[in-house]
């Protein structure tokens, strides 16, 4: 008799996605991050759901409701900090997942890649709106500064900002709508993840060599399911240590002060995972130019499949491109550091140099390196 998992309409989908899925035999731990992101999303939805049961999205009570969760709700403190630090783990996994895709040329599966870029935008939007909800000083001023960037759009900018705010400043209406969107977006993200996996399973996974692996496939379970469980344990350990020992390590102390529209914090900055984009935004003196650079810093990922000039897929056997890739990583770390510094010399100059280098590597140097490597191999 055929196993029920191979015949049942629903179990068959699960079977073909997670059990009998043919996977390349050479996948390294860099392929763990997709499943880790799934776990992160699950943790965020679960903790977020329980937080939403006690949170009130009203500007008069939001800050106090978060304090109430931490002090009075059973294990509310662990829910709150697991949710806040879970977002950090989510972004660490996201950036490593994208980095893996860039290094091994996974972006040549353009449908999967472009759904992934949309997912990145959706997760960033969700995280931004979530940061506003505790209604502390940095929440309020972060929301004010970032939404105000839309006023740089010619002609409709000011009207658009006031439409998003629901008034003439960030206030009660803004908080309520941000909570509504923050609640619903993770479910939209879950649907997009299914589309992401659908496109991935049309082509099968890439592998470290970048060479088609149709001749050498192994079943996902037990080989990669066991490998993924090790990743889960390591990530959950890291999240637990962060949540239980230093829950405020990655947060901003200003957010423990209730939002005050009359008092601006000395340094307005977003959470650490947005600092690289914030540094690019600040490095351009013109408002519209800065906003365009901010959007393009992420949107540039969408055109990477068009910029692939090499005859090889992976960077594994391309030393010049590999050097540029690690230069890009170092550059992003530099931008992250600059984003957290005050706007003064020499940080402005370093930020501008790093921003120019960021776009130069992706748009100019990497494609040229691909052409050069083809020439060196006489291809």
From Swiss-Prot:
Binding site for heme b b562: 83, 182
CC cofactor note: Binds 2 heme b groups non-covalently.
Top-level lineage group: Eukaryota
One of the record's GO cellular component terms: mitochondrial inner membrane
Main location: mitochondrion
Membrane topology, record value: Multi-pass membrane protein
Cofactor(s), names only, from the UniProt record: heme b
Residues the record lists as binding heme b b566: 97, 196
General function of this protein: Component of the ubiquinol-cytochrome c reductase complex (complex III or cytochrome b-c1 complex) that is part of the mitochondrial respiratory chain. The b-c1 complex mediates electron transfer from ubiquinol to cytochrome c. Contributes to the generation of a proton gradient across the mitochondrial membrane that is then used for ATP synthesis.
Miscellaneous: Heme 1 (or BL or b562) is low-potential and absorbs at about 562 nm, and heme 2 (or BH or b566) is high-potential and absorbs at about 566 nm.
Protein name in the entry: Cytochrome b
GN (gene name): MT-CYB
